[in-house]
Amino acid sequence: MEVPGLREGVGELMNLQDYYMTADLHEPPMMHQREFGIIRKDKGMWRHLAFSNMGKLRAFLIEQRPLHVYFSAAKYTDPGNLIMAEKGRLGADLIFDIDYDALKEPSLGEAAWQIKQLDKILAGRFGLKDRTMVFSGSRGYHIHVRDNCIQSLNRNERGQIAEDVMARGIEIDAPVTCDMSRLIRLPG
């Protein structure tokens, strides 16, 4: 049914604006050191954004009404710099991604079971304490590990952890774990 006087797409944009006004957005630790990116309808990815606090991020989201919001696993001295090599990486969280549609037994229940097993491995085998588990949007779960001991790990060291986890039967998306420049969906 057509709504009189409503142009195509306007209602959707207004709903996004309302959403960002009231959404319980997750504040990434050290957000002033994180790069942000958004996907806007019909405009693709816009990266290299930086915000000093949640109020400034929320105001930007209300104005821009993006479909998706992401933040970096890495922390930088200059997260808004357009040149990656000049951002000044300070360290990077270790991110694990389990998407249910990539599993041998594809179901959200299986993804939930695997993320719980992964959390036990990270705590028990690796002794990692600063872990946050989040629903990644609609396809599965992420675990963000922020312990100081992992911040300076390089791509190969992250890959070794990913291989260890996969050898224990956990079906993670290994490239996500290895990529220190990865942008991750902002929960909320």
Residue spans for each PLM region:
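Short beta-strand
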Residues: I38-I39, R131-G137, A174-D179
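Histidine-centered divalent-metal-coordination microenvironment in nucleic-acid enzymes
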Residues: D93-F96, A123, L128-N154, L183-P187
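Short, well-structured alpha-helical interface segments that form or flank functional binding sites
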Residues: W113, S138, N156, C178-S181
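Generic hydrophobic, aliphatic-rich segments that mediate packing or membrane embedding
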Residues: L67, L90-L94, A111-Q114, L118, ...
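Eukaryotic intrinsically disordered and solvent-exposed regulatory patches
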Residues: N81-L82, L128-K129, I170-I172
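Helical (often loop-to-helix) elements that flank the catalytic cores of nucleotide-handling enzymes
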Residues: V3, G9, L13, G44-A50, ...
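DNA replication initiation on ssDNA origins
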Residues: M1-L94, I98-G109, D179-G188
